[in-house]
């Protein structure tokens, strides 16, 4: 499971700066959930092939009232959700009473914590270590978040306590280890899902019908193999079979009785949701058709898109809507979900089972699209046809040239295109290529990523050397030029 690391500390010690440094300010996957987690930000980060989730919290000063007390409460909740805590202190300001209070709380919770002395760019790191040693959390790790100093050592220490089972491997967004032979048919890249079947995460806002859908999918007509508790918090991994196909449901809403079709008010956990997305092969995103698309839905869909997971969208509670309401919702979906237009959309009633069975076909197609690989000849042929129909634009009087393409990875498919001036390819042309590959390869339910690589200039940095013929020509020209200059001088005399 993907580790979760919380950044805590009093206000203005550099938590947000460190958060942006770790997540590389990837705004598309950083979400603020109004009302639910108004003072926590969640972001995905990667370091040396390892993926982890970072929580940025509000500051704790110890004398909070009103909304500040809510901020402190959110920070303490983040500590409970996290697997490890990075406790930031300000080296310039020195140790404060608030620092001592936070350290005491961490010791009581027996939470794996790392003391991080920030802003050491103008202070001796040894002095910072000595200053904060009374906190009783071990030696402080000195960093300067604003300049990136000490970050690698800090991550080495913090991530070193976790097993390396979340390092990205083949079939999980990394390049495939072997090329598809020319003329070979497209094949699936085997992944961890072969044993437990396709891993499906059912996610969505609270009270959209996730629990009802889980119970419907695990109904009595299905063969449930066994129930196995997840390794992190309350997520439950439930392997089951349907039509002799294996699946594993990742249920973030906790254990519930089979056959109890009731959607209680859930306690929404962002961490469990993000971890389920990371661990899944396919995400079924559930929305309430009566409420339409809200901002929170877009935030979660953005995270799914950034992680590259295959996606199926389910509009629940469709059965009780009037025709005019349905038309309006469909119009809104077309307008607001353009960025995930590759995903199948199903209109279902989890309570009555209407349309639920059709989800499995989309899950299968999405997974197959995400893990299929194609030979270089096939991808290059599609590229050549696309360029012939619509050529890349001119840059500085020269046409961008795209020469060949090959598969760089799967889940999601990564297509690497080689050519000249590729750094100038417009985003609109990249979208055109994505749609072309999606149409020709008949890809459904998975994002596509295109990466460009330019050819190296073999003469870059080298001085041109003239041939013997060019040297003789240069001599003749220089001789002719000198004679002409001499004649001009003679005439002036």
Swiss-Prot record:
Single GO biological process annotation from the record: ribosome biogenesis
Q: Could you tell me which InterPro entries the record lists for this protein?
A: G_ENGA (IPR031166), GTP-bd (IPR006073), GTPase_Der (IPR016484), KH_dom-like (IPR032859), KH_dom-like_a/b (IPR015946), P-loop_NTPase (IPR027417), Small_GTP-bd (IPR005225)
Q: The EngA-type G domain covers which part of the protein?
A: 3-166, 198-371
Region spans: Disordered: 167-195, 454-493
Recorded superkingdom: Bacteria
Binding residue positions for GTP 1: 9-16, 56-60, 118-121
Q: Give the GO molecular function terms.
A: GTP binding; ribosome binding
Q: Which HAMAP family match?
A: GTPase_Der (MF_00195)
* Annotated PANTHER family: GTPASE DER (PTHR43834:SF6)
What family does this belong to? Belongs to the TRAFAC class TrmE-Era-EngA-EngB-Septin-like GTPase superfamily. EngA (Der) GTPase family.
Assembly and partners are described as: Associates with the 50S ribosomal subunit.
Q: Can you name this protein?
A: GTPase Der
